[in-house]
Amino acid sequence: MIRKIPSFIKIYESLIKIPTISSLNNKLDQSNKVLIDLLSNYFSELNFLINIKNIPNTNKFNMLASFGDGKGGILFSGHTDTVDFDEHLWTKDPFKLTEKNNKLYGLGTVDMKGFFAFILDALCSINIKSIKKPIYILATANEETDMSGARYFIQSSSIKPDFIIIGEPTSLKLVKAHKGHVSYSIDVVGNTGHSSNPANGINSIEIMHLVIKKLLKLKIYLREKYFHKDFSIGYPTMNFSSINGGNAINRICALCNLKFEIRPTPGLTLTQIEILIQEMLQAIFKKWPNRIFLKNLFFSVPPYEFPKEKKIIKKIENSCQLKPTTANYCTEAPFLGKIGPTLILGPGSIQQAHNADEYLDCSFIKPTKKIIRKLIKNFCY
């Protein structure tokens, strides 16, 4: 078979070379259009149909590459964006693929632009003209910020694959479920005054103390009520991330802020969390009206679990010779899972993601290509 696209390493180099940082800081945020166009060209050379869509009100794009007709098939998905990097911590060029000590260094090597190089290489090694079910490749935007790429895709697409593989770095473990993430900020507004007469003011730190006591009760309740046996940390976690208040030792504190996060297990919805927090703090809200303000900090991600009624997971396990596991981090699975049962499976370690000198250990290369080929041959032929 004549190869129509560059070698695996050359593709990898071309993907890492293009900066695609997603950030809530507009000065750092970058469009992914150049990378989307490059991927489109690669998949076009393999006779895939290309559909590029702009995410409304952004300079970001999704790409869906499709080959074959009919129902079902496989959707391989990855995000095109990376996090920002600290140039003082990196010892290598983040945008140049560097091979050293059996490792491939570069921003996005594991998280997760490199996954597209594996898909393209695998497709070059099999005769896809003989497939009986379609193959889809999805490249999304903004996974590292608000996951707007995945959220927009499920609103604008009508495909229904048999299952979806998200190629996030799982060390080639088959992840069937992961926790969600929701973060909050609470402001308590008091009245300042001289500390020599506390009765002349309202100390926001003292009210926040009551809030924290209630949240700690909620923490225990979540741990006891929503235990999930499949997770290494089998309960929803709550973390108090920061607390700030006061500006002088002799002044009654007028403003106190607390930031905290909850990572729910599957079975605990984001709506339930919101209701539980409101119920737990209701008495304090009533006692101190218009002084306690609760808000979400960032876009929330629900927990995800592969649907128990979908028996196809057993076939996937046997095909890959892998046993399913769980993860404590988040992916696009809760959103893509709305169009098809979703698993997370990809090369590299999550420990390298978001770190300086991010790298892919080359020991993952051969087994990853083998697994992708097996999935296509076992489920699309």
From Swiss-Prot:
SUPFAM superfamilies: Bacterial exopeptidase dimerisation domain, Zn-dependent exopeptidases
Keyword hit for Hydrolase: yes
Taxonomic superkingdom: Bacteria
Gene Ontology molecular-function annotations: acetylornithine deacetylase activity; zinc ion binding
GO BP annotations listed: L-arginine biosynthetic process
Main location: cytoplasm
Any one Gene Ontology cellular component term annotated for this protein: cytoplasm
Active site positions, chain numbering: 81, 143
Binding site for Zn(2+) 2: 111, 144, 354
Catalyses which reaction(s): N(2)-acetyl-L-ornithine + H2O = L-ornithine + acetate
Cofactors that this protein relies on: Zn(2+); Co(2+); glutathione
Cofactor notes: Binds 2 Zn(2+) or Co(2+) ions per subunit.
Entry keyword set: Amino-acid biosynthesis, Arginine biosynthesis, Cobalt, Cytoplasm, Hydrolase, Metal-binding, Zinc
Listed HAMAP family: ArgE (MF_01108)
Subunit structure: Homodimer.
Chain's role: Catalyzes the hydrolysis of the amide bond of N(2)-acetylated L-amino acids. Cleaves the acetyl group from N-acetyl-L-ornithine to form L-ornithine, an intermediate in L-arginine biosynthesis pathway, and a branchpoint in the synthesis of polyamines.
Protein name: Acetylornithine deacetylase
This protein's encoding gene: argE
